């Protein structure tokens, strides 16, 4: 197979550009730090989840309700050969219990993994860290978000997953199932 001259030139140009990226020393002022985010909607409001703070995503599983004094607990589900507790992300963020169907589970934690149930997934985005700003969260998620990101004319609160995990641990410790 022969490659036409314009295509061969473009390939050579791309190859040279690729090689140059390894020849330039990395420094913090030359390399823009990025953050990978999942864009979701909770009760119709736009939110973002940091990919580095989650351990996986699975499609919705049958969730078996269990008696609990923890209102955010939806039940347990079988994921990756084991059982995980499934919590409503909307309820953890302070929203009233929603009747929206659960479409996906976001896995969080490593030693005691839990799943956060959500309905609307809007996509995966890589943004510059400079696009993420610290600010005062708005109701109802006050205390559960500490940052916001603006992409394509939409400002999204960035959910603080470690904070949610601590909240779950406190609630479960105070009210065992």
Regions found by a protein language model. Name each.
Residues 1-177:
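An acidic, low-aromatic, low-complexity terminal/linker signal
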């Amino acid at each position: 197979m022969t490659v036409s001259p314009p295509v061969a030139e473009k390939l050579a140009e791309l190859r040279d550009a690729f090689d140059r990226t390894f020849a330039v020393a990395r420094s913090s002022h030359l390399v823009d730090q990025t953050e990978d985010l999942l864009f979701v909607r909770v009760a119709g409001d736009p939110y973002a989840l940091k990919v580095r703070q989650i351990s996986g995503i699975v499609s919705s599983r049958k969730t078996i309700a269990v008696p609990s004094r923890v209102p955010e607990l939806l039940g347990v589900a079988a994921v990756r050969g084991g059982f995980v507790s499934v919590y409503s992300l909307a309820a953890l963020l302070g929203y009233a219990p929603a009747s929206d169907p659960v479409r996906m589970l976001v896995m969080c934690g490593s030693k005691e993994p839990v799943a956060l149930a959500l309905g609307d997934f809007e996509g995966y985005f890589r943004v510059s860290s400079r696009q993420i700003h610290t600010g005062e969260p708005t109701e109802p998620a006050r205390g559960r978000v500490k940052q916001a990101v603006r992409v394509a004319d939409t400002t999204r609160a960035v959910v603080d997953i470690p904070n949610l995990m601590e909240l779950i641990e406190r609630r479960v410790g105070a009210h065992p199932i």
